[in-house]
Design a protein with these regions (language model features):
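A glycine-rich, often tryptophan-bearing local segment used as a flexible ligand/cofactor-contacting loop or short
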Residues: 78-146
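Cell-envelope and extracellular/periplasmic
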Residues: 14-15, 74-76, 201, 225
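Catalytic beta-strand/loop cores that center a nucleophilic Ser/Cys/Thr
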Residues: 46-49, 122-199, 234, 248-253, ...
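Helical hinge/lid and interdomain linker segments adjacent to catalytic or ligand-binding clefts
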Residues: 25-109
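Extracellular ligand-binding/catalytic regions of CAZymes and related secreted enzymes
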Residues: 2-6, 126, 190-265
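Short glycine-rich His-centered loop
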Residues: 5-27
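Short hydrophobic segments within beta-strands
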Residues: 12-14, 103, 198
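Short, solvent-exposed loop/turn elements at domain surfaces
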Residues: 17-21, 180, 206-207
Length: 265
């Protein structure tokens, strides 16, 4: 995955609710992926494209993934419709250095669960209650430009316990009007790839139109972009290429090229 001076962002959205629910379509008439693309497009130095589940190869053929430095993922109604092969390809790209920003209900996506290795389950309630997203790591780049918290008048409650591995960094904790709290902004590294999960974003509320939410996602994309050189694939180093002269000793089940010798030889 080549590194570019201009980060290439792909926003993937299953794009189902906007076409099946009048309430969601009224908020995101062109799809929430277009709202996010418009917001990211205002950030100088980003190249932004969108992809949806109904496109060929579910929107992410190998050529698109190869041309993506950070993938933004939103899914809810069609987690199981995402092909296992696609989830595996995304996982491979992340481990090789592609950044991943997972939003809201994407915590149940195949790709997020693969990378976390845990259930990723949580508690939830859809009641349009107030959410206060507290910035608990104000010095982190993802929190740049924010105040003490983000106030959302209407939101879906996500609550603990949240079945994720301990985050490398915890940036936001949400409080909800009903009393619950939630680790709503977390980061991890998998291989050479950076991952940011951000919980606000229920589809029936205009959360992705909120300037501070857009700022967090933009900051998250900038933070998650590839760092340095990509991870190298495993490779065999022949004896004659050792940095210091050595002599091979003992038996081996590999041939001189490093491949397993035939079991039937």
């Amino acid at each position: 995955m080549p590194r570019m001076q201009t980060p290439r962002i792909t926003i993937w959205n299953e794009y189902i609710h906007e076409r099946e629910s009048a309430a969601v379509a009224a908020i995101y008439p062109r799809g929430l992926h277009r709202t996010l693309a418009d917001a990211l497009g205002r950030q100088p130095g980003l190249t932004v494209r969108t992809a949806t589940l109904d496109e060929p190869d579910q929107g992410l053929p190998p050529a698109v993934l190869d041309a993506t430095d950070v993938l933004v993922w939103w899914g809810h109604a069609a987690h199981e419709a995402v092909k296992d092969e696609l989830a595996a390809r995304v996982q491979e790209r992340v481990i090789a250095g592609m950044g991943l920003v997972v939003l809201h209900s994407g915590h149940e996506s195949k790709i997020f669960k693969r990378l976390m290795g845990t259930s990723c389950h949580l508690c939830w309630r859809e009641a349009g209650e107030r959410e206060r997203v507290w910035v608990i790591n104000p010095g982190h780049p993802i929190a740049a430009g924010l105040g003490d918290c983000i106030e959302l008048e209407h939101s879906e409650m996500y609550g603990e316990p949240f079945g994720i591995p301990t985050p490398d960094e915890l940036i936001f904790i949400s409080w909800f009007e009903g009393g619950e709290v939630f680790r709503g902004g977390c980061t991890w590294t998998r291989g050479s790839g950076r991952i940011f999960y951000f919980s606000p974003g229920h589809e029936t509320y205009p959360i992705y139109h909120h300037p501070d939410i857009q700022r967090v996602i933009t900051n998250g994309v900038l933070w998650a972009r590839p760092q340095g050189r990509p991870a190298q694939v495993p490779r065999h180093v022949p004896v004659e290429q050792a940095r210091q002269p050595i002599v091979a000793r003992g038996a081996s089940v590999h041939d001189q090229a490093g491949k397993l010798a035939s079991r039937h030889a």
